[in-house]
Amino acid sequence: MGSAWPAEIRKIAKISKRLLGATVILGFGVAEAQAAEFFGTFSSGPAGQFIDADPRPLFELSSDFSFDDPNGLKWPVPTGTRVDGASIPQTFWSIIGGPFEGAYLKASVIHDYFCETKSRTAHDTHRNFYYGMRANGVPGWKAKAMYWAVATYGPDWTLETKVVNELQCKPTPFGGRTCSSLPKMVTTTVEKQAINLEDPKALAVAVGKFNAIARNLKTSDGETLDLLPTGVVSGSLESIETNATNAREMFATSDYRLDPKLLGVILEPKQIKLDSIDAWPDGQIPSFTDVQAQGLPQTGGLVGGNGIVLSPAEFENFEQRLDLSPTDFTLPSKLE
């Protein structure tokens, strides 16, 4: 009996060593899978030229351009298409840069075209914008901030399928007409009202909220999206979509003006370059309760300001802080 124990212990030790090795291998496998995450591929291009137009320049494609998303769906844009970057609300151009600058260009062309044709749902079109940014090298936290911005403040629509009856008639040899009612399926576009960013009051809140979303995502490397009275909102794509839908509804009803806590934590309504906005101090995202206890802070301090949870009495003061600085960006004459 006594001599059996060491042998048994050696056997257990060997099994444990194998399990540890398997765990290490599995860990490397997960890391490699994350590093190799696939977001899709663009065709060559886009090639085209910029055309002077009112109210903003247009970019005209001189050849076909497309994106294959990670689900295998192709998003083609034909030669001759003209886009103007308007699918990204112009308010945010001063924050992210022009839509035809840097790593946004390819995703912006695809996004613009499908926001104009509305041949696919707004949900899929905006999600594809995120995939396109990631495929072109935009960091995850920044792409999520942009995804939230277009899902919240960009165009919105749904596609609805219904049955309609089409009447077809033809003359008879006796002077009459015979008719047939032919039912068929059609798909219609149902557009939803956009948030009115020409209203300075709504614009101040929209910019302040976006700044807070960007700071949360930057601090957490894309893991945390929002701080609400109900708790912390994760930075998953599904959470971004739900949060954006709720924000659109809140702006549509103006409920936030009666109960500003619904906005959650926001920042100063300043137009700050996305790359320049500060992370939260010490890399720690505060709780909603901690920010609420501070009241409306004075301007200054962090780039983007300190966190704010508004009360009804503070709205006027907050809205007067809206930054209306001009937006400057450069357009090349053409792209090849």
Curated annotation (Swiss-Prot):
Arranged from A to Z, the UniProt key words for this protein are: Plasmid, Signal
Q: List the Pfam families.
A: DUF1353 (PF07087)
Highest taxon of the source?
Answer: Bacteria
The answer to whether the entry has keyword Signal is yes
Signal peptide segment: 1-33
Q: InterPro entries in the record, alphabetically?
A: Phage_CGC-2007_Cje0229
Q: What is the protein named? A: Uncharacterized protein y4jT
